[in-house]
Amino acid sequence: MAKSQRDLKGWQYFLDDAELNNTDSVNGEPTTPSRRSRRGKSTSSQKISLKREEDELEIKEGDFLLVQQDNNSPEVAIVKEIKFGNDNFLDIIVSWFIRMRDIEEADLPKVEEYKERSQLNENELFITSYLDEVKLGEIIDKVNILSEEEFNNDIVIDDSNKASTFICRRGCDSAGELFTDVFDFRDLCVLFEKNHHEFIEFIRRKTVPVAYNANKTHDKSKSIKDKLDEVETKKPKQKTVSKQILDEEEENNDSSDEFESAIDLQDEPSSDELESDEDASESKNKSPRKRKASSKPKAVKEKQKRVKIPNNHSKFDDESRQFITSVVSPLNKRMKIKDSSKPSILALSPRKPKKGVSKGENGKNGSLGVDASSEAFKELKEKLHTSTRLSSLPCREDEFTSIYLNLETAIQEQTGCCLYVSGTPGVGKTATVREVIAQLRELTEMGELNDFDYLEINGLKLLSPNVAYEKLWEKISGLKVTASNAALLLESYFSQDTPRKPLIVLMDELDQIVTKKQNVMYNFFNWPTYSNSKLIVIAVANTMDLPERVLSNKISSRLGLRRIQFIGYTFEQLGSIIKHRLDMLTKQNKRKVIINSDAIGFASRKVASVSGDARRALTICRRAVEIAEKDFLSSKEDPGNEQEIENESYHVQISHISKAINETVNSPISQFLMSLPFASKLVLAGVLLRMKRSGLAENSLGDIIDEMKNSLTMLTSRDGDKVLEAIDSKMTLIDLLYGNGLLQNLDSTFNSKDTNIRILRFKYIVNELVENGILQQNVRGERHSLINLNISEEEIVSVLKRDKEISSIL
């Protein structure tokens, strides 16, 4: 990349084998370039080559280069295109290779040549479809990349060629997690010579998971030979440049249509780069500027849409309908959730975290121009996200072992059982169970454990508790029936002695499945007791004593005594969890952005003192990194500090953690809760106490009213007793809130026993909380209406505990 002709000092560039030196032969000063006319010829057919004057190194499209960016380790890339740009005088677009040393051993294909780390070839490269810009000063030298046959037959690796000779036989995605089958790299080079856009498109379709596409299976199965034949077939259909210009006015729609089709095949179709990429159009049609001058731009868009529609309309409609049905139906077992850690084909360019290579310095778009520090901040935020996949679960070894042994024993003995897992939100209950299932799956694949089925039912995702019957029967039979029929079929199925695999059912958010008759819970805990059921139920809830307080004796007795409690994380454990995620960073990014140990300890202690919720600790740290990134970018804007900042590490300090915590404390919801009167806070305290006492997320309004009055009666703290001392030494909070008004309470004839059942203006208080989104109310009759929180319980607790009067109740 050269921003101007001045940056080409020491280099020469050539167009169509005609030397166009960019320096004056006498003075060595840059000369004014002549205007590049687009009228006589198409610039898309011009190929640019470069020559370094120092060592006469020549670079052209298709060359393999050794590139070093920002003092990082040198990496290998193939030159996809050299072109004149809009923002820069010259753009050098490359596609990166990933070295074997940058691939995690666990991510390598499960084949014989990658079985042991000691047998891996350190000179093996993996081609990716990730595109990037490089600067002329970052180019070190050319390298040789050979196919597997050439490498094994003709090459001996020694110190003389170890750094310049490589082998490539597979491609992979930018994260080094998804790999292609073995191919002949020489055939891939032939495809590049014929059409470098099809070359990138071929790698991209083989390595990047696609979103829904009716023809995706067909595209995945294409080999390099098929793609070469396809390119050869397309060649005769292309028009010559002169023919396109002559026919521009008469056949405007057709040529525009061809250009739009070519754009669809390009790997960087961002709207802000269409004009800059006009010279690299695959079909070599007229420039986009000519197309913009067309008198019928709308017709072009309509034609583009028609080109993308498959010929087999009925098949396309059926597949679309099947796809939509599988997504919108919560009961379809074939519904798959896409993994967030894998890039999508819809992205303009996938990320490349494992290469440790800077993406440039412009910062003008997401695929090109992200410096190393920004990439470090980005990866750090990804690792601190709660959805990040972990290789292990720290600080939950004992609970993991208990669940693992119970499930393994039940599977081996082919018996049913119930397991109750309890703990506050964010302590790793569901994650631990899923990790146990994953470990058991690996044992099954290795043949060391009997095969089993697994089903996860989340109470919050069910329209009603009875839907659990439908999901379980669908897992067993693959058929959808009504809940009532499913219950009958399940009862008959588990009663019969038929060959079946053990079935593990994870019932998450158990308190949401509780009904008045409790028949759903009874059946799910009763079926494992059948001798031939082989049903293993794992019930997960937030409170340990929920079976005794909520479920009847006949249900709690069937649940059994296999109970595992997850206690809240201590501040040492939270610190270990955060450090475990920081260890997942690449070595380069670890040096660029550092979270101080004091900052980790501060965040851990703050969260551990409230709830021990690991999700909250990670969220605070992630927000602190965002605040630190903002400070970094603002300091980078100072021209004097830019070079110094780029070469130094940036630290996330306690001040950043403190700001992140203050944001949660001073959020709009927190400020609204702080402004509420005592009576409204008392209602919220009653909701929290009732939830704690019952273990249920939803509680009746009548129970909350009783909880409020009982709490005030039992209030014995100094602040609670003397809060009304200035008005009347004998007046209590019950007299004030449950009387008919302050003036009547001050009347000497008022009897404290003559109080109302509810506090004054109670209906107005509840409606205010509902309208502001704090509570949700299911109106089924006033006293029997169900109330549940609409915001985080932790946020309400943190606000109420800062209130002297109300904190005594909690």
Swiss-Prot record:
Report residue spans for region: Disordered: 21-52, 219-317, 334-370
Q: Where is the composition biased (Acidic residues)?
A: 247-280
Subunit composition and interactions? ORC is composed of six subunits.
One Gene Ontology cellular component annotation held by this UniProt entry: nuclear origin of replication recognition complex
Residue ranges annotated as compositionally biased, kind Polar residues, are: 21-30
Q: Where does Mg(2+) bind?
A: D508, E509
Where does the BAH domain lie? 57-183
Q: Which organism is it from?
A: Debaryomyces hansenii (strain ATCC 36239 / CBS 767 / BCRC 21394 / JCM 1990 / NBRC 0083 / IGC 2968) (Yeast)
Q: What is this protein called?
A: Origin recognition complex subunit 1
Which residues are listed for ATP binding in this entry? G423, T424, P425, G426, V427, G428, K429, T430, A431, E509, N542, R615
User: MF terms per GO, please?
Assistant: ATP binding; ATP hydrolysis activity; chromatin binding; DNA replication origin binding; metal ion binding
Which InterPro entries did the record assign?
Answer: AAA+_ATPase, AAA_lid_10, ATPase_AAA_core, BAH_dom, BAH_sf, ORC1/CDC6, ORC1_wHTH, P-loop_NTPase
Q: Does the keyword Nucleus apply?
A: yes
Q: Where is this chain's protein located in or outside the cell?
A: Nucleus
Name the gene: ORC1
Q: Basic and acidic residues compositional bias: what residue ranges?
A: 219-235
Q: Which PROSITE patterns match?
A: BAH
Alphabetized UniProt keyword annotations: ATP-binding, DNA replication, DNA-binding, Magnesium, Metal-binding, Nucleotide-binding, Nucleus
In the record, biological process GO terms are: DNA replication initiation; mitotic DNA replication checkpoint signaling
PANTHER family per record = CELL DIVISION CONTROL PROTEIN 6-RELATED, ORIGIN RECOGNITION COMPLEX SUBUNIT 1
